[in-house]
C-alpha cells in the first residue's frame, strides 16, 4: 500500500510517496523505459536523482527552496519541476519573478551535483581524475525581451566555469565571463533535443554537442561541480511581464555523471 503525504513549500504543494521505482539505463544515460504517465508520478521516476540536490525559484528573498535526498525521490512542484505527460522527460521552469540565490540575480529550477546518495556537496578538481557530465535536454521556452537561458554547466568555487547557453536561436558554450566563447549553432529551434557533454581532466574541459567536440577550455579550479536544469538569465528588471507566465524552461530526458 502506498503512503501519501502532502508537502507545502513556499507556496508550492507537492505530493510525496514512500514508493520508489528502480531506474533503468537507456543508451548509457539513466532515464525512463516504457513507463506510462501514471508510473512517473515524480521526476525521480524518470531520472536517477540519487546524487543531486534541487534548487527551486521559490522561497524567501535570496533563500530559494532546496530539496535534498531522500525527499527529492518523491517530490514534484508543478510547474517548476515535474515529469512531462508522456513520462519521457522532466520539466524544469524558472520564471523571471522567481526567487534567486544571494550570489545571483537570476532564478533557477536546477540540479546541483552531490555525492554519497545526496548527503554531501560534490567538489572536484579539473587537474585530478576525469569528470564527465552527459545530459540529453531540450530548451522549450525562453523569457521575453532577454531570451537567454542556461541548460547545463560546470560551476567552480566562485562562479560558473563553462555552460551551455541559449540566446534566442544561438546556442553558445561559454568560458568564464566570455558568454560567446564558442557558437555551437545559430539556428537552434525550441524543443529540439540534443546531447550536451562536459569532460574535465588534465586542467582542460572538453565540451561536446551531439557527440562532436566543439571546444576545449583551460581550467585549474579544484572545487567544481555539475549543474543542470533551467537557469533563466533574465529577471523583472529586463523582461516583461514580471510574472510566472514569463519563464525559461528546459526538458531533460537523461542525465549521467561519472568520475574516474
Give a label for each model feature.
Residues 92, 173-175, 207:
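Short hydrophobic/aromatic-rich beta-strand segments that constitute the beta-sheet cores
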Residues 172-195:
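Short, aromatic/His-centered strand-loop micro-motif at the edge of beta-sheets
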Residues 28-78:
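N-terminal module-boundary/linker segments of secreted carbohydrate-active enzymes
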Residues 38-59, 128-132, 144, 219-260:
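Ligand-recognition surfaces built from glycine- and aromatic
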Residues 71-170:
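Secretory/extracellular carbohydrate-interaction modules
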Residues 1-28:
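Secretory targeting and sorting signals
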Residues 133-135, 191-207:
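Short tryptophan-centered beta-strand motifs in secreted/extracellular beta-sheet-rich domains
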Residues 208-212:
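Short strand-turn-strand beta-turns centered on an Asx-Gly dipeptide
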